[in-house]
Amino acid sequence: MEPMSVKEDLRLFQSTLLQDGLKELLKENKFVDCILKVGDRSLPCHRLIMAACSPYFRELYFTEDGTEKKDANKEVVLENVDPNIMDMIVNYLYSADIDITDDNVQDVFAVANKFQIPSVFTVCVNYLQNKLSLGNCLAIFRMGLVLNCPRLAVSARDFIAEHFETLSKDEEFLEFNAPEFFAIIGCDALNVEKEELVFELLMKWVRKNKENRAKALGDAFEHIRFRLLPEKYLKEKVEKDDIIKADPELIKKLKVIKDAFAGKLPQIKEGEKEGEGENELPGFLNDSQRLGMFNRDLILMINDTAAVAYDANENECFLAAMAEQIPRNHVSITSKKNLLYVAGGLFVDEENKDSPLQCYFYQMDPHSPNWIALPPMPSPRCLFAMGEFENLLFAVAGKDLQSNESLDSVLCYDVDKMKWLETKKLPLRIHGHSVISQNGLVYCIGGKTDENKTINKMFAYNHKKSEWKELAAMKTPRSMFGATVHKGKIVVVGGVNEDGLLSSCEAYDFGTNKWEVFAEFAQERSSVNVLSVDGVLYAVAGFTIKENEDKQCVPSEITDIWQYEEDKKQWSGMIGEMRYASGASCVSMRLNVAKMPKL
């Protein structure tokens, strides 16, 4: 055993022994030399324990020079305290056990703060930090400030900053006083993509109590980053605001801001020390971007090692999350709410003798680089595809992992209820198809039947009517192809059919219900990932046929990235080899590059 481990065991043993002994002495009423009078209750305890755990009680029993007060009363009267709460705290000091709940945490916190009992105070802080939610974070932020607990206030502020766009719509936000409000809107960590939202919330807050709050606008200006606003917005919305126009001091500040837009910053006063950095300019000229302004539309590649985000504009890669638990050959989907779900894959649980084949289901945590395990799919399958409608995710058809037969069943996952159900079956059994979600419908395109016949059919599912409707068929039957919605049309790329690999592409017009020829891909390829990112169409990785060392033609994985050039109507190669694309599914997702390590 390591020396440190031995020391830790000895310390823990001694602490437990001491705690149990003190608890026994209290229970047997031995050496009791203090009575806490709380309301109609009398709580026996030991001075030694109370003084050791609380500076408040230490002052009752000792003078400033540390001499024990001989005349200190045995009975200590505690005013305006709930006796049940104080009893809980005293028991905690002897047992290290306390039942903190949503109902009592505020009262326990207040009493621990009043009598300076840091151990109980810390327990409450930990509890509240773990309980932070959209419903309570504003109140917890205020509590942290009122009780002078920076750790809690900062945790709550950071939570508010992360969910700023949602919480800014809450009327409670407008009840903050000026220092509370400014502490939030001045935060670098605000998850806001446009400074306009911060300014508009400020003016809404002012107008809530115009008579008193208009006077605080001068200070409030220090927390708005006007240089991050579009110049047109500054002229039309800020300068023309009636409250701002009526204040001469604000007009002067706007003049300085307009000069800054023109490239003229105020001169640094003589005598100021060099290197003061951000203190050189007034706050309203701060042009540091908020955290949310680092959000970008990225190509996210998920394989059984990691989820890596690629910024095609900057040619940079970022680690979104490690992904050792994600099986190969899974299916991924990004919802309209920008949430990533990963389902299926080839995984055999050898310890589960009854059901060794598993179809796991994960969501990437939007606030941390972790995966959240969700209820697994009830019927293990592969070669299926996923779509969505409102708060529902659909796993359409595929191949049963046990029987190896194609399926027509459609599984439906309710995101709110966290439950899988089965919905209206597809009109035929297929696998290797693609699914697209658009205009409130789920489109199932192409695929292959158990008779090894590739199809060109397309069906649209209306969940409200619980019906599948056949629409215009593709010009070319295909399976194992890429598909996405780009500029209002479905674009399909490559795939395979009875004639072999395909390089042909097609586009579907929702308005006319017609397919048209799209620019041919540069290479015959199957299993290609096709995605539209920030208005640009990309094709990532896939399989083609290559000649090996033995001069045999075999399937070979390609990990390149192609971009479609709209003006030239052709595909152009961007990257010859993207190692993170190997074995990966790819989706378009908006992520914050400031929160991810750069690779």
UniProtKB/Swiss-Prot annotation:
Q: Kelch repeats span which residues?
A: 339-391, 393-440, 441-488, 489-535, 537-591
Q: Which GO terms describe its cellular component?
A: Cul3-RING ubiquitin ligase complex; cytoplasm; cytoskeleton; M band; sarcoplasmic reticulum membrane
Q: What is the gene name?
A: klhl41a
CDD domains per UniProt:
BACK_KLHL40_like
Instruction: Give any single GO term for biological process.
Output: swimming behavior
Tell me which UniProt keywords the record has, alphabetically. Answer: Cytoplasm, Cytoskeleton, Endoplasmic reticulum, Kelch repeat, Membrane, Repeat, Sarcoplasmic reticulum
Q: What is this protein called?
A: Kelch-like protein 41a
Null allele phenotype:
Morphants exhibit leaner bodies, smaller eyes, and pericardial edema. At 3 dpf morphants show reduced birefringence in axial skeletal muscles suggesting disorganized skeletal muscle structure.
Cellular location(s): Cytoplasm; Cytoplasm, Cytoskeleton; Sarcoplasmic reticulum membrane; Endoplasmic reticulum membrane
Q: Where is the signal peptide?
A: none
Query: Record's InterPro entries?
Result: BACK (IPR011705), BTB-kelch_protein (IPR017096), BTB/POZ_dom (IPR000210), Kelch-typ_b-propeller (IPR015915), Kelch_1 (IPR006652), SKP1/BTB/POZ_sf (IPR011333)
Which chain positions lie within coiled-coil regions? none
In what residue span(s) does the BTB domain sit? 32-102
Q: Which organism is it from?
A: Danio rerio (Zebrafish)
| BACK domain sequence ranges | 137-239
Per its record, what are the GO molecular function terms?
Answer: ubiquitin-like ligase-substrate adaptor activity
